């Protein structure tokens, strides 16, 4: 029977190139030209993890190898420097080695044993007991390594992974290491293949759905056999909605695909507001004996894109209110545990988003699961725009992995390629699209085009045209390809700094928090969303970007400023601006804060983001006037600053619906710690996040406070990241933080011990804060 075990514990890591000895005589060269080709160095089975036993007898100190758990990013452990590459986050990149000792019981002999790597950045070479098994050249594509023939049962085995980060895969922070989960998988020699079940529901009548099912089985035995696959379609309550079965012949050391079909009446549909999911549970039998059990999730939904009327999901018109996102996390780098990946998706759902673009590569499986569960419309993007065999295999892996996900409506072959306007680009896209259709012909195939999208050679080959920015070309593109749906695959990229309400600062590389246009192609959030909603033929838009991310930066700033949520997971004003565009529950948000000592009497621009029809602004009990708010617009007042209370009241239908007040605080007197809802558990991987606020003597937040804050954590966890100021240059795990704009955050990686996690924050002259979290 199938066993899948998370394999993230008990790894050793060394941040060194550690080359093997270059032999110059026949004997050792003869040996290393055999299957066990590596007889020296860290890939060798007998290499001492603490002693360098192959370089002229010299010894390494034991500290060079450290015990680590996955996910792990060794690049983030450095300190950013101005001489570093600004696109890659100003960090020094290098090579690293991982080793893991393990023993499998003799009872596993006869089974198929594989390792499943969700992601290794960037190039990975995998060895078992000195034998080369796999080279992988994409840090974002998962891969499987079959160790069946080489593993020794009942004995110590050594897995070694060499990671090279010199080859950048993008213009953002790549990180380095085994930064996603690894699994040890054991199956019978007859079992479902990797991503081997494909479920493609089709509506056949008013309430009737046909459910074609493909089951790809593999036979790693040395004799052909007959196999039967029995499938149960199971709803969220565990009730069986339908069953089906198929039989077929499996060749020795080969694969076969079995086909069957079920029928389901009146299933609960997957939708952006009610994302119901089903399971396909597959049992595999040979000669009546159960050999494997495998499950995959799927959903029932219909969609079509009308080039004149927009996107329809389950017969209802829906606009994509989307965001793009990179896969890193400001408080841990590229190594992001599953609970944080899910938390990030919950945060953008709170913002009102219903769409997610996996820019510009496959995202982690926990992210994709959360998108299914929370009802997002996903544009699923591969990393490399290549029709080479390696490029196509990466694409096939993405499609096989995600083709059962109801959230995925688009396959994206590429992003911002110069070749999009070349015949070569069309050739590559058509080859990639053909591969996609072999595996899944139920989604729209697209590309995100920024280089003269009105002249794209592949425009007529796309199921839907994705346009990045280029606002003046939206209408001409629609006119040129009137039979092809169009959507905005990337827009805005408006840089703002949390809590910075002054002109842009070259010294700190801070940007004003007020929304604005960059130029006529790069519109701000307000103008972009107005333009999207004014065009019913647009399917919607994916905004750049949900979260600030490392890289694409200007020193001394360490990150891009386009996010609606800052690098350390604090909401920016843009978060609430998006809420005003994308949500219906009445809301108002005032900017700026109301702490402006020394500016008494000066005129300050006060903006209010709201989804209400009218807003009235009050200062210290005096009305400053009521404004009618243009849909997707904002209210704006020029206010002479006076300390006190500034209140915005939102009205709809002539009735007050919501209000918000910002107050002038006193000087900061204390710190306050708040545990974020990351739903962390004591599993050795999860991260708990705490926000630290500066408050005055009355407990009011001080939004302009600054101080040096030091964090402490109990033995139940260790600090992996702390930050506030995007222009502070320190090791991320350093617990000493320069608080900016009254807030900082700390991330604690939990161990396996249950109990009370205690976190403390201290700043000279202020009352300390403590927070306890049961884990």
Label each region the model flagged.
Residues 5, 12-18, 73, 77, ...:
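Accessory beta-strand-rich segments of carbohydrate-active enzymes
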Residues 152-154, 216-306, 634-636, 640-644, ...:
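Extended acidic/polar, glycine-enriched regions
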Residues 213-217, 283, 604-609, 649, ...:
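Beta-strand-rich structural segments
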């Amino acid at each position: 029977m199938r066993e899948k075990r998370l394999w993230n514990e008990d790894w050793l890591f060394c941040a060194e190139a550690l080359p093997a000895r270059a032999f110059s005589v026949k004997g050792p060269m003869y040996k290393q030209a055999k299957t066990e080709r590596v007889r020296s160095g860290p890939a060798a089975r007998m290499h001492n993890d603490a002693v360098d036993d192959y370089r002229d007898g010299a010894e390494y100190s034991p500290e060079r190898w450290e015990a680590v758990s996955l996910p792990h990013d060794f690049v983030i452990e450095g300190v950013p420097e101005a001489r570093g590459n600004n696109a890659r986050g100003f960090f020094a990149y290098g090579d690293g080695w991982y080793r893991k000792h393990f023993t499998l019981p003799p009872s596993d002999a006869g089974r198929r044993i594989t390792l499943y790597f969700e992601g290794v950045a960037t190039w990975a070479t995998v060895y078992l007991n000195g034998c080369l098994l796999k080279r992988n050249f994409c840090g974002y594509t998962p891969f499987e390594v079959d160790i069946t023939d080489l593993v020794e049962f009942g004995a110590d085995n050594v897995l070694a992974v060499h990671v090279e980060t010199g080859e950048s895969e993008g213009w953002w922070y790549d990180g380095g290491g085994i930064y996603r989960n690894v699994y040890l998988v054991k199956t019978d020699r007859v079992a479902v293949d990797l991503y081997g079940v494909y479920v493609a529901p089709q509506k056949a009548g008013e309430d009737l759905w046909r459910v074609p099912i493909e089951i790809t089985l593999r036979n790693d035995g040395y004799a052909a056999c007959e196999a039967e696959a029995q499938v149960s379609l199971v709803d969220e309550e565990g009730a069986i909605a339908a069953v089906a079965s198929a039989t077929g012949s499996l060749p020795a050391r080969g694969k076969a695909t079995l086909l069957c079909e079920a029928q389901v009446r009146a299933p609960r549909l997957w939708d952006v507001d009610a994302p119901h999911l089903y399971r396909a549970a597959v049992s595999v039998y040979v000669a009546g004996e159960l050999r494997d059990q495998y499950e995959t999730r799927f959903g029932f939904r219909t969609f079509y894109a009308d080039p004149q009327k927009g996107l329809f999901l389950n017969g209802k018109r829906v606009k994509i209110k989307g965001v793009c996102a990179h896969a890193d996390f400001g408080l841990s780098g590229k190594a992001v545990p599953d609970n944080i990946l899910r938390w990030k998706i919950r945060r953008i759902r709170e913002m009102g988003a219903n769409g997610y673009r996996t820019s510009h590569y496959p995202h982690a499986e926990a992210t994709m699961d959360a998108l299914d569960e929370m009802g997002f419309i996903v544009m699923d993007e591969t990393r490399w725009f290549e029709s080479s065999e390696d490029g196509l295999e990466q694409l096939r892996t993405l499609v096989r992995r995600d083709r059962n996900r109801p959230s995925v409506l688009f396959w994206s072959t590429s992003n911002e390629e110069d070749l999009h306007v070349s015949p070569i680009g069309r050739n590559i896209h058509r080859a990639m699209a053909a591969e996609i259709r072999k595996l899944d012909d139920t989604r729209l195939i697209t590309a995100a085009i920024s280089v003269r999208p009105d002249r794209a050679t592949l425009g007529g080959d796309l199921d839907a045209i994705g346009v990045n920015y280029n606002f003046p070309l939206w209408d001409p593109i629609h006119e040129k390809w009137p039979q092809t749906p169009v959507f905005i695959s990337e827009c805005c990229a408006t840089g703002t700094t949390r809590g910075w309400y002054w002109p842009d600062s070259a010294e700190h590389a801070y940007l004003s928090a007020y929304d604005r246009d960059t130029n006529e192609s790069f519109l701000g959030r307000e103008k972009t969303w107005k333009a999207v909603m004014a065009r019913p033929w647009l399917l919607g838009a994916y905004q750049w970007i949900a979260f600030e991310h490392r890289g694409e930066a200007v020193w001394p700033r360490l990150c891009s400023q386009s996010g609606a949520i800052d690098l350390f997971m604090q909401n920016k004003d843009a978060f609430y601006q998006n809420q005003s565009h994308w949500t219906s529950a009445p809301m108002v948000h005032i900017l700026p804060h109301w702490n402006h000592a020394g500016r008494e009497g000066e005129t300050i621009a006060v903006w209010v983001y709201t989804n209400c029809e009218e807003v009235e602004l009050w200062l210290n009990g005096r009305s400053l006037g009521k404004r009618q708010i243009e849909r997707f617009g904002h209210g704006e007042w020029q206010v002479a600053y006076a300390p006190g209370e500034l209140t915005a009241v939102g009205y709809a239908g002539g009735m007050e619906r919501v209000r918000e007040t910002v107050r002038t605080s006193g000087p900061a007197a204390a710190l306050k710690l708040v545990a974020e809802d990351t739903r962390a558990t004591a599993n050795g991987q999860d991260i708990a996040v705490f926000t630290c606020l500066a408050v005055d003597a009355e407990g009011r937040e001080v939004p302009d406070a600054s101080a040096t804050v030091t964090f402490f954590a109990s033995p139940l966890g260790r600090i992996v990241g702390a930050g506030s100021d995007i222009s502070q240059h320190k090791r991320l795990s350093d617990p000493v933080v320069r608080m900016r704009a009254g807030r900082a955050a700390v991330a604690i990686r939990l161990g396996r011990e249950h109990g009370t996690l205690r976190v403390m924050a201290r700043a000279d002259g202020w009352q300390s804060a403590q927070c306890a979290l049961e884990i």
